């Protein structure tokens, strides 16, 4: 039966599944907030993160199922390198990366986004938020879908036997609470389902995050543990359950005092150090050149691996009401994994813009993955005149 899905697996692995290597746990330092009213929360959150890191480290190779959970949920996030966990404004779509950034300015907002993927694969997101208690606790609802379309059904001998359809969906409900004017916490609980023809799998997913703002309101810090949870049932009866694509991220954003610009430094995959992988293209280069290529120095390997954890992005903000935004980001891991040996290009870079007209916001994002092209994301967000709930 596995052979029936061979074409589908080749298709989605190329675009939605990043190659991963053996993992190592890494300790890390989190922010310390001395003036926090609830001082018991930080130790509990630290314990939660480290415990999750230890559990995830048990899965050899770091391979996971439900990798669509890691895809960017909005055009703005695509333009900022795929994620943004340390910014909180009026954009409801930001809760897709960190549920703790939900705030009063997002209530009553409805966000709709569509992602154009290769092979006519279509993906979309919807998000909505509202207040539930004293303007300090907010709830958000979300829906994420991917339609892979109709594909040939083949057996292990690559003989075509009809067609099948495949899709993946995620339904979410999340909550955020403001402890005081500088610290917020939040979490999102999701039910995810994946259907590959007659083979169906489901999962329960949890995101948990922190968001901190300094006294100047110019520096913000975000910490999030994404895609914790478990696979409820595997695709094939009797098979062992697979891990989800867990990712612990920390980021700091700085808005310049005298210039309308904000930059962000994000470090992802805190729960494993080695994110490099064996690249067979290097072997092809050896064959073409006809001689052995020198192995990279250990310091070069260390630096390359370090920068694969990092995403850099910037956002130029124009207008007193932030009516226009230009965005650009660089993801070194994407550049190295999707690049062609000996050939340059813009893979790893992404860009986009946002335009606000009255109560409507329009966003465009494009991420360059390969010389052959990139992925385009568009979105619209509006303030509803009357709350749904």
What are these regions (language model features)?
Residues 1-61, 314, 374:
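Bacterial Sec-dependent N-terminal signal peptides
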Residues 58-389:
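Subset of outer-membrane beta-barrel
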């Amino acid at each position: 039966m596995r052979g029936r899905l061979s074409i589908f697996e080749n298709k989605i692995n190329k675009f939605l599944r990043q190659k991963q290597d053996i993992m190592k746990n890494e300790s890390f330092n989190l922010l310390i907030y001395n003036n926090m009213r609830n001082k018991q929360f930080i130790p509990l959150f630290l314990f939660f993160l480290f415990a999750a890191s230890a559990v995830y480290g048990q899965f050899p190779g770091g391979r996971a199922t439900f990798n669509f959970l890691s895809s960017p949920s909005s055009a703005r996030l695509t333009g900022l390198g795929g994620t943004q966990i340390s910014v909180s404004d009026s954009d409801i779509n930001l809760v897709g990366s960190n549920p703790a950034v939900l705030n009063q300015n997002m209530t009553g907002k409805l966000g709709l986004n569509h992602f154009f993927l290769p092979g006519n694969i279509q993906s979309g997101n919807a998000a909505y938020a509202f207040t539930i208690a004293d303007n300090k606790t907010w709830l958000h609802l979300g829906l994420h879908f991917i339609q892979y379309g109709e594909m040939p059904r083949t057996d292990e001998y690559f003989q075509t036997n009809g067609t099948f359809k495949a899709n993946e969906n995620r339904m979410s409900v999340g909550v955020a609470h403001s402890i005081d004017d500088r610290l917020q916490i939040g979490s999102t609980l999701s039910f995810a389902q994946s259907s590959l023809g007659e083979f169906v799998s489901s999962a329960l997913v949890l995101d948990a995050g922190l968001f901190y703002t300094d006294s100047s309101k110019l520096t913000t810090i975000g910490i999030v543990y994404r895609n914790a949870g478990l696979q409820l049932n595997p695709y094939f009866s009797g098979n062992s359950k697979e891990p989800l694509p867990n990712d612990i991220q920390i980021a700091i954003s700085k808005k310049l005092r005298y210039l309308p610009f904000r930059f962000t430094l994000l470090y992802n995959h805190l729960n494993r150090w080695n994110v490099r992988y064996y690249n067979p293209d290097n072997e092809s280069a050896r064959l073409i050149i006809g001689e052995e290529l020198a192995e990279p120095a250990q310091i070069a390997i260390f630096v390359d691996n370090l920068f694969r954890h990092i995403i850099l992005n910037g956002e130029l903000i124009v207008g007193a009401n932030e009516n226009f935004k230009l965005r650009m980001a660089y993801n070194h891991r994407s550049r190295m994994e999707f690049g062609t040996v000996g050939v340059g290009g813009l893979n790893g870079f992404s860009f986009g813009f946002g335009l606000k007209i009255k109560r409507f916001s329009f966003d465009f994002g494009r991420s360059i993955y390969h010389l052959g092209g990139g992925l385009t994301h568009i979105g619209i967000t509006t303030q509803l005149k009357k709350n749904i709930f």
